[in-house]
C-alpha cells in the first residue's frame, strides 16, 4: 500500500514531512520526530483537520489520544478545543462542528493510566472488583506492600520442614535480617508487572536455569551477549597494541619493541579467527596468550622517552584487557558454570513462588481495603480487554468505537501498554489505525521499564513509501534552536550514536536540520568550559592558599561567574514575541544536571553573586531544623521513653534548656531512661528549671491525650499555636522558608490521614521509613519557577521543555553503576541473575548468567545515558554551555588524543562503551574539532569537517577561589546608590574568616571513628568486610529496642526483647545448686512481681533451654566453680585505633565498652561464656552448618572481649564459649587469631 497524501497547498507553512504526518492514513503510522520538530503541533493539527472535515464523518469521541502526562493531555485538549472554536467561528452554522465542541469534554484524551481507569470503572464486573474502589498514592501502596510482605515471610518461617524456603533465605540474605529477601521479592514483583502476564515471565525466569541437557555455554540463549563482549574487548586489546606499534615506529621510537609487539598482535588476531562453536577451544586460546618480556633498551638516550612510555602503557593496557577477559569469562571450567545454574534452580523456583504469592496477597489486601494503586490499572484493564489470549468483546467494542488511536511519546511505552494499545486498535497492521509519535533518541525512562525497542522495531520495518507493514515519517527539521546548537549536537552525536552502542544510527535521517530563524549574532558559539583541578603552585609563599575545594563547589562558582558575566554584559536573547533581541534575564537561563547532588553548592555560589536561584530539589526536608524538631516532638508524644528525641525537644526552642540544665536533669537519676530522670527531677527539685519541666510534662500529657482523641493535623496545629513555634521560626534567618516547611508538614500529615492508615504511631513509623529509604520529600518552595530566577533541574525534568540558554553541568560526574553491580540483576529477556552461593563451602562467585546480564545492562545503560545527553543538548534555543571539572587537563587530553587520530567519523565502539561519564564522550568527540587541534597544537589530530562553532576555555581551580574572585569584582558605588542597592563593605577579618571556613581536617578517615564504641558496634562494622555477615545491618538501619507503649505490649516481642529477658534470667539464677524447673518458675514469678520482667517476656522465656545449659558440661563446671563466677561484667578498654582500622594511621586510641555475660576467673586463667538467642533449629540443615556461620558472626565480639579482659585482669583468656538457647548448642571460639 503506497502513500495516499493530498497535495500540500502552496500557502501552507508546513514542511513536506510535516504535511505527510498530518495527512497520512490507511495504515499504522510512525512519526520519528526529532527534538524541536513541532511534533505536538503536527499531532494537534492532524486531529483538528480530521474533525473539521465533515466528509470524513469522524467525531472527537471516536478518537483515543494518549499522552505521557496529565499536563500534556490538558494542553492537547485545550489546543484541540481552540482549533475547533476557530473553525466554528468561520462556519458558525456547522452542526458537525458544534457537535465536536460539545463532545470534546467526553473525548478520550488522557494518559494511558487514565484510560485504563475509565475501562475499569465501566467494566469493573469483568475484573471482579468492587466498583467503589479508591485510587491510592504510591506512599500508601508501599506501606500496604510492606505489611503484606512481612506477613508472607512470617508465614513461610512458621511452616514446618520448609527446607526450600530456608535454603533460599540462606542463599540470598544475611544471617540476621530478611531485609535483602524483602527487597528482592519487592523488586521482582515490580519488574514482573512490566510484562503483560507477570506469572508467565516469572515461570520463564525459572526455565533459564534448566541446564541439564546443555552441553556447552555456546548453547545458552544469552551466549550472543558473551560473544559480543569478548569480541569488543579483544578488539580493544588489538587497538592498544596498534597504538603501541605506532609509537614504536615513530622517529626515535622504541624500534626494538616492534618484534614483541607484533607477536602479541598476531596472538590476539588469531583469536578473532577462531570458531565460536567451542567454549573450551576459546578458553584455551585466551589462556595460551603469552606476552613475552619486552626487550631492554640498551642506549636509552637514543629513544624518545615519551614514545617509550606510551608504547609500554598501551602494551600494558592490552595485557590487562586479555587478563580481564580470562578472569570474567574463563576463571572456572565450563561444566562448573553450567552446574551452578542447575544448582540454583530450586532457589529460583522458590523465589518465583514467593513473588507470585506476594502478588496474590497484595492484591487481596488492597481489595479488602477497597483500594487500587497505579500498577493495578494497566493489568486490570488488560484483564478486561484480553480473554483466553484473544481480544474480548469489550476490546472489540473499543476497536469499533475508535476510528484512530494516537499516542504521543511512543518511545517510552512498555510491553503492557503496547498490548493494551494493540487490543483497542484494528488487528493487522496493513489496515491499522495506530498513529505513533516519538523520538527514540529521547527515550530516557528505562528505569521505569520503558521499552525503546518497540519503537526501533517499527522504525526498522515501516517504510517511508508506505509499502509494507506501516508508514514511517521522519521529522528532522528543528524549529527550536539556532544553527550553533544544532551543529554542536550533530557534531557530537554523529561520533557517538550507532545501532551497535546506542541502539540507533545517527544518520542523515536522524540528524537535526535548521528550521528556525534567528537574527545574526557572534556570541552564540557553543562553549566548553573545563576546570583543571590540578593545583597550581603559588608564586609566593605568603600568598593565601585555601584548602582543596570540592569539584562541585568549584564548578558551581565557575557557572555563577559565567551567569553574572552574561547578565552584566546584557547578553542578547531573541524574544520570539517581540520579534527582536533584548538583554538576557535570569529566567532565560537553566542549569541542567544528571542529578541534583550539586544543588546546595550551586545555591551557595549563586548567593555569593546575588543571583536569584531556584532548584527543583527533592531532598533535605527532614534535615531542616524546624521539621526535625517537630518530628522529634511527635516521637516523644507517641512514646516519651526515647532519649534522643526527648533531649532534642528539651534542647530546642520549644523548651529551651541549655546543656547545664540538661545535665542537672540527668543527674537526678543517672541510670535508666531520660524521661524517668525528668520526672524525678520535677518531683525532687525546687528551681525555675523544675517548674519549666513540670509545665512541659503537663503539656506533653495534654498532647498525648489529644493524639488519641483528635486527628494528626489537629495535634500539629495545636502544637504550633501553643508553642508559638511557627511564629518563632518565622523570625529566624530564612523564616519564610522555615514556615513553608512547617506548613508542608501539616499538609503531608493531612494527606497521610486520607490513607487507610491512621494515628500518630503509624505516622512516625511512616516518616522513619521514608528517612531510612532515602525517600526525602524536598523542602517546601517559596520561590516559583516562573519568577525571574536562574533555574536548576535534572535532565529528566527538562524533557519536553526549552530554554534560551542551557548550561549542562557536572559532565565529569560518574555514571550511576549501582544497578549493574547489584547482587541481583533483572532483565526482560533473561529473567533473574545473581551470584551463586555454595552454602556448604561458604563460597560466593558470579554465575555465567550474571556476567552476561551485567554486560547487557551495561550496554543498555550506556545507550540510555547517551540519549539523556542528547535530551540535555537539545533543550537549548540559542546558547549551549558545557561545563566539567578534570583532575589533570594535561593527562586527560592525552587520553583523548588516542582516538583523535581515528579517521572514521564514529568513535571506536570500545571508547564509547567504556565511558564513565559524559565528558568521556564529549572530550573524545570535540578534540577532533579544529579549534581543539589549534588549542593543543597537535598535528596528529584528525579533524572532522564541521560548521560547529566551538569556544574552549580551560580554567584552573585557583581562578575560582575567594581571593581571586575579589579581583574580578568591580563595584561602582555611585551606581549602587542610584539604584538603592547596598554597598559591599570589606572587612579586615575576611581573610581570617575564610581561612577558618575553608579549613579541612587532614585525618578524614578518623572522623568516621567515634572515640567511644561498643563491642557490638565494632562487630557490625567488621562484619561489613565479611561477605558471610549481613551487609545491610549498619547501625543506622538497626531496630532499637525501646520499652513499648502499653497499648502495643500485647504484640509479639522482638528477638532483641526476648534476648534481654533470657539474659536477665541467666544473671539471676542461683548457682548454689543444680537449678530445677520449679526453681526457675519460682524465680520468674518473683521477677514478674518486682516488674523486672513483663508478662510478655515471662511467657517468651523457655525454661527447658535454660536448664539445658546447666545440664551441659560447661554449665556443671560453672556450678562447681560458683565462687569464681562473675556475671554481667561491664568493662571499658582503650585500644589503639591502628589495631582496629588498618587504613587509619593516627596515634590515637578508641574506648571500647562491653558487657561479658559470664566468666570463670581462676588464679591464672579466665573462661568467657556468652549467651545467644539466635534462631538455629529449622533454619539450618544441621548444627555443623550453623556452627560455621555462628563462629563467623561472633568471632570479632569474643576476641575483643578476650583482649580487653586479658589487658584489664592480667590473666590469660584460655577458653571462650557461646551457648545457643535454641537447640542448646555450645560453640567454642578461638581467641588467639587476630581481627
Swiss-Prot record:
Keyword DNA-binding: yes
EC number: 3.1.-.-, 5.6.2.4
InterPro entries: AddA, DNA_helicase_UvrD-like_C, DNA_helicase_UvrD/REP, P-loop_NTPase, PDDEXK-like_dom_sf, PDDEXK_AddAB-type, Restrct_endonuc-II-like, UvrD-like_ATP-bd
Keywords, alphabetical: ATP-binding, DNA damage, DNA repair, DNA-binding, Exonuclease, Helicase, Hydrolase, Isomerase, Nuclease, Nucleotide-binding
PROSITE patterns: UVRD_HELICASE_ATP_BIND, UVRD_HELICASE_CTER
NCBIfam families from the UniProt entry: addA_Gpos
Annotated ranges, domain UvrD-like helicase C-terminal: 509-800
Protein name: ATP-dependent helicase/nuclease subunit A
Amino acids binding ATP: 33-40
Amino acid at each position: 500500500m503506497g502513500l495516499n497524501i493530498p497535495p500540500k497547498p502552496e500557502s501552507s507553512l508546513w514542511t513536506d514531512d510535516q504535511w505527510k504526518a498530518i495527512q497520512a492514513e490507511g495504515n499504522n503510522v510512525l512519526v520519528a520526530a526529532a527534538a524541536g520538530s513541532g511534533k505536538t503541533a503536527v499531532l494537534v493539527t492532524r486531529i483538528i483537520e480530521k474533525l473539521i472535515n465533515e466528509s470524513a464523518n469522524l467525531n472527537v469521541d471516536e478518537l483515543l489520544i494518549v499522552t505521557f502526562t496529565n499536563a500534556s493531555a490538558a494542553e492537547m485538549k485545550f489546543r484541540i478545543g481552540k482549533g475547533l472554536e476557530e473553525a466554528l467561528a468561520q462556519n458558525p452554522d456547522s452542526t458537525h462542528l458544534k457537535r465536536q465542541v460539545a463532545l470534546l469534554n467526553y473525548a478520550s484524551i488522557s494518559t494511558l493510566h487514565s484510560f485504563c481507569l475509565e475501562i475499569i470503572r465501566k467494566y469493573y464486573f469483568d475484573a471482579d472488583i468492587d466498583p467503589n474502589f479508591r485510587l491510592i498514592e504510591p506512599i500508601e501502596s508501599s506501606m500496604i506492600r510492606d505489611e503484606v510482605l512481612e506477613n508472607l515471610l512470617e508465614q513461610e518461617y512458621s511452616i514446618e520442614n520448609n527446607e526450600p524456603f530456608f535454603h533460599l533465605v540462606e542463599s540470598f540474605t544475611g544471617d540476621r535480617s530478611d531485609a535483602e529477601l524483602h527487597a528482592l521479592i519487592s523488586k521482582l514483583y515490580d519488574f514482573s508487572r512490566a510484562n503483560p502476564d507477570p506469572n508467565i515471565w516469572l515461570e520463564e525466569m525459572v526455565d533459564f536455569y534448566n541446564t541439564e541437557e546443555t552441553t556447552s555455554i555456546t548453547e545458552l540463549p544469552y551466549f550472543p551477549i558473551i560473544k559480543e563482549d569478548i569480541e569488543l574487548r579483544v578488539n580493544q586489546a588489538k587497538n592498544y597494541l596498534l597504538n603501541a606499534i605506532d609509537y614504536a615506529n615513530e622517529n626515535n621510537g622504541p624500534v626494538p619493541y616492534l618484534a614483541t609487539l607484533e607477536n602479541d598482535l598476531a596472538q590476539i588476531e588469531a583469536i578473532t579467527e577462531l570458531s565460536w562453536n567451542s567454549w573450551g577451544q576459546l578458553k584455551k586460546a585466551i589462556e595460551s596468550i603469552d606476552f613475552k618480556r619486552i626487550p631492554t633498551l640498551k642506549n636509552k638516550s637514543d629513544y624518545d622517552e615519551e614514545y617509550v612510555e606510551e608504547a609500554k602503557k598501551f602494551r600494558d593496557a592490552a595485557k590487562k584487557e586479555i587478563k580481564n577477559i580470562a578472569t570474567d569469562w574463563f576463571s572456572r571450567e565450563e561444566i562448573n558454570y553450567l552446574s551452578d545454574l542447575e544448582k540454583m534452580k530450586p532457589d529460583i523456583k522458590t523465589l518465583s513462588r514467593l513473588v507470585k504469592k506476594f502478588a496474590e496477597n497484595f492484591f487481596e489486601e488492597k481489595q479488602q481495603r477497597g483500594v487500587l494503586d497505579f500498577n493495578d490499572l494497566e493489568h486490570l484493564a488488560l484483564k478486561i480487554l484480553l480473554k483466553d489470549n484473544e481480544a474480548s468483546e469489550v476490546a472489540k467494542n473499543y476497536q469499533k468505537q475508535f476510528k484512530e488511536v494516537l499516542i504521543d511519546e511512543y518511545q517510552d511505552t512498555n510491553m503492557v501498554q503496547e498490548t493494551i494499545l494493540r487490543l483497542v486498535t484494528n488487528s493487522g497492521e496493513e489496515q491499522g489505525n495506530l498513529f505513533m509519535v516519538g523520538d527514540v533518541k529521547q527515550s530516557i525512562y528505562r528505569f521505569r521499564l520503558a521499552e525503546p525497542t518497540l519503537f526501533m522495531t517499527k522504525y526498522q520495518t515501516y517504510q517511508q513509501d508506505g509499502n509494507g507493514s506501516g508508514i514511517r515519517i521522519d521529522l528532522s527539521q528543528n524549529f527550536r534552536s539556532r544553527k550553533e546548537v544544532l551543529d554542536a549536537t550533530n557534531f557530537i552525536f554523529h561520533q557517538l550514536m550507532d545501532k551497535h552502542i546506542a541502539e540507533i544510527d545517527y544518520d542523515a535521517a536522524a540528524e537535526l536540520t535548521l528550521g528556525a530563524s534567528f537574527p545574526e549574532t557572534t556570541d552564540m558559539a557553543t562553549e566548553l568550559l573545563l576546570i583543571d583541578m590540578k593545583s597550581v603552585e603559588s608564586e609566593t609563599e605568603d600568598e593565601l592558599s585555601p584548602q582543596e575545594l570540592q569539584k562541585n563547589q568549584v564548578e558551581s562558582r565557575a557557572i555563577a561567574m559565567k551567569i553574572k558575566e552574561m547578565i552584566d554584559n546584557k547578553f542578547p536573547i531573541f524574544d520570539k514575541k517581540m520579534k527582536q533581541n533584548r538583554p538576557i534575564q535570569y529566567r532565560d537561563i537553566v542549569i541542567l544536571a544528571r542529578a541534583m547532588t550539586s544543588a546546595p553548592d550551586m545555591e551557595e555560589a549563586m548567593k555569593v553573586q546575588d543571583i536569584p536561584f531556584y532548584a527543583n530539589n527533592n531532598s533535605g526536608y527532614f534535615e531542616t531544623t524546624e521539621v526535625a524538631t517537630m518530628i522529634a516532638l511527635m516521637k516523644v508524644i507517641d512514646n516519651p521513653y526515647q532519649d534522643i528525641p526527648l533531649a532534642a525537644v528539651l534542647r530546642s526552642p520549644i523548651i529551651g534548656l541549655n546543656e547545664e540544665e540538661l545535665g542537672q536533669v540527668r543527674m537526678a537519676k543517672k541510670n535508666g531512661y531520660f524521661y524517668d530522670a525528668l520526672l524525678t527531677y520535677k518531683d525532687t527539685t525546687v528551681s525555675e528549671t523544675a517548674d519549666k519541666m513540670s509545665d512541659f510534662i503537663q503539656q506533653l500529657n495534654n498532647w498525648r491525650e489529644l493524639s488519641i482523641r483528635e486527628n494528626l493535623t489537629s495535634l500539629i496545629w495545636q502544637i504550633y499555636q501553643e508553642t508559638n513555634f511557627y511564629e518563632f521560626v518565622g523570625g529566624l534567618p530564612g523564616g519564610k522558608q522555615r514556615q513553608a516547611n512547617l506548613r508542608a508538614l501539616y499538609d503531608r500529615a493531612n494527606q497521610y490521614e486520607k490513607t487507610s492508615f491512621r494515628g500518630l504511631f503509624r505516622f512516625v513509623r511512616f516518616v522513619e521509613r521514608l528517612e531510612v529509604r532515602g525517600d526525602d520529600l524536598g523542602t517546601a518552595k517559596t520561590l516559583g519557577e516562573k519568577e525571574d530566577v536562574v533555574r536548576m533541574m535534572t535532565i529528566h525534568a527538562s524533557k519536553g521543555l526549552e530554554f534560551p540558554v542551557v548550561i549542562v553541568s557536572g559532565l565529569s560526574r560518574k555514571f550511576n553503576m549501582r544497578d549493574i553491580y547489584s547482587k541481583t540483576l533483572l532483565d526482560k529477556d533473561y529473567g533473574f541473575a545473581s551470584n551463586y552461593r555454595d552454602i556448604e563451602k561458604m563460597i560466593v562467585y558470579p554465575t555465567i548468567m550474571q556476567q552476561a546480564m551485567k554486560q547487557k545492562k551495561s550496554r543498555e545503560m550506556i545507550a540510555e545515558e547517551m540519549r539523556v545527553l542528547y535530551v540535555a543538548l537539545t533543550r537549548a534555543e540559542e546558547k549551549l554551555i558545557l561545563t566539567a571539572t578534570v583532575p589533570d587537563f594535561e593527562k586527560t587530553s592525552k587520553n583523548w588524543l588516542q582516538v583523535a587520530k581515528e579517521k572514521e567519523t564514529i568513535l571506536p565502539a570500545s571508547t564509547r562503551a567504556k565511558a564513565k561519564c559524559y565528558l568521556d564522550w564529549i572530550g573524545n568527540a570535540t578534540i577532533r574539532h579544529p579549534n581543539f587541534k589549534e588549542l593543543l597544537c597537535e598535528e596528529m589530530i584528525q579533524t572532522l569537517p564541521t560548521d560547529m562553532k566551538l569556544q574552549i576555555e580551560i580554567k584552573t581551580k585557583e581562578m575560582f577561589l575567594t581571593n581571586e574572585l575579589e579581583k574580578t569584582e568591580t563595584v561602582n558605588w555611585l551606581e549602587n546608590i542610584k539604584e538603592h542597592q547596598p554597598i559591599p563593605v570589606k572587612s579586615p577579618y575576611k581573610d581570617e574568616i575564610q581561612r577558618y571556613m575553608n579549613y579541612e581536617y587532614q585525618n578524614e578517615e578518623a572522623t568516621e571513628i567515634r572515640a567511644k564504641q561498643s563491642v557490638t558496634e565494632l562487630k557490625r562494622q567488621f562484619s561489613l568486610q565479611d561477605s558471610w555477615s549481613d551487609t545491610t545491618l549498619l547501625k543506622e538501619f538497626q531496630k532499637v529496642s525501646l520499652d513499648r507503649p502499653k497499648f502495643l505490649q500485647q504484640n509479639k516481642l522482638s528477638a532483641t526483647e526476648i534476648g534481654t529477658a533470657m539474659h536477665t534470667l541467666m544473671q539471676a539464677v542461683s548457682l548454689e545448686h543444680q537449678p530445677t524447673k520449679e526453681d526457675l518458675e519460682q524465680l520468674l514469678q518473683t521477677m514478674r512481681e518486682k516488674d523486672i520482667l513483663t508478662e510478655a517476656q515471662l511467657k517468651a522465656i523457655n525454661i527447658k533451654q535454660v536448664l539445658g545449659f546447666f545440664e551441659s558440661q560447661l554449665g556443671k563446671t560453672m556450678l562447681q566453680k560458683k565462687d569464681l563466677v562473675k556475671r554481667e561484667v561491664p568493662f571499658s578498654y582503650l585500644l589503639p585505633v591502628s589495631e582496629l582500622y588498618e587504613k587509619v594511621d593516627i596515634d590515637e586510641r578508641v574506648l571500647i565498652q562491653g558487657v561479658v555475660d559470664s566468666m570463670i576467673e581462676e588464679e591464672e586463667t579466665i573462661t568467657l561464656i556468652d549467651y545467644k538467642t539466635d534462631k538455629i533449629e529449622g533454619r539450618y540443615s544441621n548444627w555443623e552448618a550453623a556452627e560455621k556461620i555462628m563462629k563467623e558472626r561472633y568471632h570479632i565480639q569474643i576476641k575483643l572481649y578476650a583482649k580487653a579482659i586479658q589487658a584489664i585482669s592480667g590473666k590469660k583468656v584460655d577458653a571462650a564459649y557461646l551457648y545457643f538457647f535454641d537447640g542448646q548448642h555450645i560453640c567454642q571460639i578461638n581467641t588467639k587469631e587476630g581481627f
